[in-house]
């Protein structure tokens, strides 16, 4: 019975995350984790749900770090950990670079594109070079137009827009070029 309830909460968490109802996703992942405390996929789903609510906090970081430490070759866990770490502890450049390297050597068929995505975030957050980050995103999308890469670019453009008042048109232009629908979030 408990496994059935875990599955129910986990699937609802995934469903609500895909529907961009992140608070509901968070609540369902939390319920799933009450039943199966060490479920790596539920912990990762909860970390992503927190991130999507712009809650790049200690909880999201600890969840992401835990899942990564349990399965350091899992590309999904690498991405989640990287995204939390770079936003909360950007001084951890050795770890951040290792995560990019780990992702590029993972089993994922899109490891190069996702590695480039993390590299673009690194260039933006650590090197503070928006234009170079955008150039990396554009090159990556030209080779392999993956929606998660676009979502990452969209997030960076939104942050840059808030900081500097410019940059929002770039994501819109790329969305049109590759027929991406920002409302249809199909990323990690």
How does the language model describe each region?
Residues 8, 42, 77, 115-116, ...:
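TPR alpha-solenoid repeat register
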Residues 20, 54-55, 89, 127-128, ...:
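Residue-level detector of the short coil/turn that links helix A to helix B
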Residues 5, 14, 39, 48, 74, 83, 112-113, 121-122, ...:
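Residue-level recognition of tetratricopeptide repeat
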Residues 25, 60, 96-99, 133:
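Single-residue signature of alpha-solenoid repeat helices
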Residues 14-17, 51-52, 86, 124-125:
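Position-specific recognition of the canonical hydrophobic site in helix A of tetratricopeptide repeat
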């Amino acid at each position: 019975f408990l496994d059935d309830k875990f599955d129910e909460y986990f699937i609802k968490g995934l469903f609500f995350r895909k529907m961009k109802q992140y608070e509901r996703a968070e609540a369902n992942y939390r319920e799933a984790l009450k039943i199966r405390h060490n479920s790596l996929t539920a912990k990762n789903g909860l970390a992503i749900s927190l991130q999507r609510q712009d809650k790049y906090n200690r909880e999201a970081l600890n969840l992401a770090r835990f899942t990564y430490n349990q399965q350091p070759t899992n590309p999904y866990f690498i991405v989640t950990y990287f995204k939390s770490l770079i936003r909360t502890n950007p001084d951890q450049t050795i770890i951040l670079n290792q995560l990019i390297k780990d992702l590029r050597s993972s089993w994922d068929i899109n490891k190069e594109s996702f590695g480039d995505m993390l590299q673009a975030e690194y260039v933006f957050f650590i090197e503070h070079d928006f234009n170079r980050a955008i150039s990396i995103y554009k090159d990556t999308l030209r080779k392999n137009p993956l929606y998660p890469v676009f979502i990452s670019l969209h997030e960076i453009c939104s942050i840059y827009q808030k900081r500097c008042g410019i940059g929002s048109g770039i994501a819109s232009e790329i969305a049109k070029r590759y027929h991406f629908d920002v409302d249809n979030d199909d990323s990690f």
